[in-house]
């Protein structure tokens, strides 16, 4: 058993027991500018924000599977209980509210497997979003960024440990680790794990409500946020699902 605590971003689910602690305030998470993150959406269940996500076409969103999965398995909550807010940097207002018509959880996802493995779901929208300056799909990256690359992520998660969700979309930067360093630091072996570590002493990282947050490099979607380690703002690497490992699966549905 690993001496590392993995916390799902949607719920404070303790998967491995370790020392608990409260991380520092994530002051370097900055407010997103209007139109700067046109791919980012808020996934809402019964009208309440649960996760982030990214538009990958005008009627498909990608997010983390554990955001929609019942008990960590292949069955999802009813699609009609969800909608997405697209085209707004405000969690509670603006943009376009579009209900879901279908939820597709990755066929190899199971929360009983290694944390974050295959933790992806595709969400089909009932109607296409209206594309404009604030609402645009993002292209999928074709290869994993080199170690040390600086990626940005955007989400509505808490800006500090035990805080409430942010009203406005926030952005921050992290550096990617090599696959081998990522696996060693988190005691995990799955190939689709991508780790982002603090930039210098910048503790801006994932927190509750950030699951499904898109990680971007060179204007392309590289990964989807899956879990954080040791409490948000701990300064430990965050776990993402590398979407470049799942392009074939995504392209089966998204055209």
Task: Place the predicted regions along the sequence by residue.
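C-terminal subregion of chymotrypsin/trypsin-like serine protease catalytic domains
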Residues: 2-20, 56-69, 173-176, 208-255
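Chymotrypsin/trypsin-fold serine protease catalytic domain
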Residues: 98, 120, 125-126, 131-201, ...
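Acidic glycine-/aspartate-rich tracts in secreted/extracellular proteins
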Residues: 21, 66-69, 87-92, 126-131, ...
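Disulfide-stabilized extracellular ectodomain repeats and their linkers
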Residues: 38-40, 64, 81, 135, ...
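N-terminal activation segment of mature serine protease catalytic domains
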Residues: 22-46
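Conserved H-D interstitial segment of serine endopeptidase catalytic domains
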Residues: 43, 61-64, 68-109, 179-181
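A conserved glycine-rich beta-strand in the N-terminal activation segment of trypsin-fold
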Residues: 40-58, 114-116, 212, 233
């Amino acid at each position: 058993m690993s001496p590392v605590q993995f916390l799902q971003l949607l719920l404070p689910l303790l998967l491995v027991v370790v020392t608990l602690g409260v991380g520092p305030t994530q002051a370097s998470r900055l407010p997103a500018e209007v139109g700067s993150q046109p791919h980012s959406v808020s996934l809402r269940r019964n009208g309440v924000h649960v996760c982030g996500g990214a538009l990958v076409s005008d009627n498909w969103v990608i997010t983390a599977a554990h955001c929609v999965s019942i008990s960590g398995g292949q069955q999802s909550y009813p699609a009609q209980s969800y909608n997405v807010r697209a085209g707004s940097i405000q969690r509670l207002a603006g943009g376009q509210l579009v209900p879901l018509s279908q939820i597709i959880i990755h066929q190899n996802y199971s929360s009983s497997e290694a944390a974050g493995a295959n933790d992806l779901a595709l969400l089909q929208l009932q109607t296409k979003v209206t594309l404009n300056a604030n609402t645009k799909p993002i292209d999928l990256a074709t290869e994993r960024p080199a170690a040390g690359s600086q990626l940005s992520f955007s989400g509505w998660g808490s800006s500090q440990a035990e805080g409430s969700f942010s009203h406005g979309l926030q952005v921050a930067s992290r550096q990617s680790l090599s696959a081998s360093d990522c696996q060693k630091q988190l005691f995990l072996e799955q190939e689709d794990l991508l780790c982002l570590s603090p930039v210098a002493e910048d503790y801006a990282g994932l927190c509750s409500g950030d699951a499904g947050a898109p990680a971007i490099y060179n204007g392309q979607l590289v990964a989807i946020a899956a879990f954080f380690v040791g409490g948000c703002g701990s300064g430990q690497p965050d776990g993402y699902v590398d979407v470049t490992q799942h392009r074939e699966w995504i392209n089966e549905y998204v055209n």
